[in-house]
């Protein structure tokens, strides 16, 4: 469930970017008698000038200065490499003390991680936003600690909607139902908009697009008990709507949804060719850079009920290397409000703590203004079931096959049933 700035995070230059900070060496102790904490973190920057290395370097230096018995060594890797590198380190018996990566469930299932209550102070643990903390639990115990987050909203091109008569000039737009959304898309089509509504169900991020529509249709990938409900009646009806009312009516443009990736949909939006699509904070920056006027609102629901946004998070975890006290103290420091907000402000992400949430919400900084609509949706957002070891495989099934559900001859019930069957087999449930 990565919050990449493709999704939230963009990897650096695409190559390995390894930097050791505050010293070198791979041991957990030193000849000076100090404890050495080895941290592996992902790079959220787009290149050397805004690499996450700077944040971690300063954090490690300040922490080491205030805690002379502990030295923190941080290795910063590109998103292309960091998950695989940590997995390799664990396999070789050289796991880092702390890793900030995209997923934790496999390590938790293997008994490799400390639970949060053996690491964090009560104050820090209580400060984590509830839906994010809950997503870090496996069988009731929290092993994944949220690091940064984002939510997904519906974007619209203001000029295109005004020109099509969907909204008056200078007015805002918030459709409440799918019927209103469909009516707007029809007006956009009649006015010559190439893609009234983009529906990227291609292999890049089909699971995200699917989950957003499922939630809006009253369903979801899992229920409140975290059991898979992929082939529920609500979800089948959602994909029947997408197939019949959007794709079948010619409202999703010339690209087949199953072959359209989010990246290309975003590019088309920033080129002024798309009226409406689901997106994340990075699209705000991309659209503004090309002079696109936009609005951002929750995706309307099938019946006008209160919408629930989809959330995405990246994770931090502590491996059982014999230093729970030292690892926990460093994590307490990492989660201090000033550190949380410094990182999220730099990369246009959302804080995962209540204190950071309030600080961003109350901020007068114009740079944070576009993020506040995403921020307000975060506390009630629904996240992927990342605590399930099966999720990686289920996500892959969505990417491979869900686009076929909305093809002209698509059978949503059958496609979702096949994905659900794969999920149940992976879970070992009937």
Say what each PLM segment does.
Residues 65, 249-250, 288-350:
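Extracytoplasmic/periplasmic substrate-recognition and gating elements
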